[in-house]
């Protein structure tokens, strides 16, 4: 399946103002989304909507990945934590933006998705991504502190462990809520957390000790 099928999607996202930064555009253009889903779903790979990946989980819509990358204000060399690997697609896009001098740690609680995403990311050469099996609501102290943290599932609130593992000056992005969810952006400045509501969203539930 040709990767150039994503070009009209990207053009639409740019025209709607969802994505602006060239680094985000280039990253989404370069990551083969069809490699992160099952063969039976490949024909839908470059449709801008969430897709089932099994185990009650989804691969995020392309526009949502773009929006989150924009709002995280990603840059080369950053240390990033993703909570909820899923297919590994979102981590791949982020890894392209932070580059070889950066690192993405991504945590997945479902063993089958952990194995699948780890295999896909490795085969495609995303060597700056470390996939961890565990409870993402606890974060991952081994690679902390993080310049950026983002959560790909919605919890009742943001686990305190994630704020503790966020660098000063860092940004944390997470959907918050049960049925009605809001994508929130938190910034840590001199140890204090400021928050900003971004938009209404729909994510799968955040499961874990500090989630649902």
From Swiss-Prot:
Active site: residue positions: 60
One of the GO biological process terms: protein modification process
TM annotation in the entry: none
GO cellular component, as recorded: cytoplasm
Catalytic reactions on record: [protein]-L-isoaspartate + S-adenosyl-L-methionine = [protein]-L-isoaspartate alpha-methyl ester + S-adenosyl-L-homocysteine
Record keywords, A-Z: Cytoplasm, Methyltransferase, S-adenosyl-L-methionine, Transferase
Record protein name field: Protein-L-isoaspartate O-methyltransferase
Taxonomic path: Archaea, Methanobacteriati, Methanobacteriota, Methanomada group, Methanococci
